């Protein structure tokens, strides 16, 4: 246990706070001793697309994206998982007032599934009755039914049909159903998955998309190396397809203000220091900062007598996910465990314990799987998993 006390936000506090073992603080959220605040709404939100009052800063990014998609160009946005790509895009897109559809390619299983999913999403914003004349141009007519439970339109194609023909017909319909003055916005999330859905799918999509005039494409991706290869490799079909934009962490000062103002309702004069503690632990990661702040706020409301609300919240989150963390730890090999432990402790990876090529390959795999991210250095994506590793060491 580290005994040295540091002022929150000081030059060394992020290192010390980031690696000290979890303090044995136990919470019982069932015991609500603060009746006065029990009906207050938690001002922090995580896990879903964040909008309106829960949205954090990103004013410049939103303004840039909104202005950019008012042109006839396409946008490519690269950012690590849980950095808020979808929230930023959705805020900018909604400000344009134009119709849009959004599809996560991680949920797409095949080319025919991609075609059906795009058509399904389009039916949500454009009634099928207004598209019947365009559907007659389909070389393979889809089966469209209404879900009796949700009332939504379900789209499917007969098995065994030419999937590339299906996709071409659907993308052509999306373009023909709109005009240059009122372009449809098509958002494809986790776009790097295009390479795993089917061979040469990227070539087919690029050949269709580059001829369209009535659609703005926004292509999002979380795998830095794969997205860069798709859009910056001269041999790639999508080379220079659109404006390339990278979304980093939130500026600390802006994020601190956001957290402090919302924590003040529970912690009054202590909110500045608590905001610093949160950002020191999370490294200003948007998702995990919101998650920790939400749990700290809960501690302040339900157990206001808790001496260190931040570490109480960290302890609670880590214990809540301990079984998942253990399962993950047991599923990876010893090289990966060593790398995660070294990164958790803030130590170098070039120690001679493993060959440099072995470490490099392992880090790249961990990065692809989402366990490790790189900004100015390699680090664990999940600070709570980092804390679990340190506690188990």
List the model feature ranges, each with a label:
Residues 386-393:
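Short, amphipathic alpha-helical interaction segments positioned at domain boundaries
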Residues 353-369:
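Short amphipathic alpha-helical interaction segments
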Residues 229-280, 301-304:
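Helix-loop-helix "sensor" segment of P-loop NTPases
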Residues 284, 290-357:
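Winged-helix-like regulatory helical subdomains adjacent to P-loop NTPase cores
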Residues 2, 9-75, 80:
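A short, basic N-terminal segment
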Residues 71-74, 78-83, 87-184:
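P-loop NTPase nucleotide-binding core
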Residues 157-223, 232:
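Conserved Walker B catalytic segment
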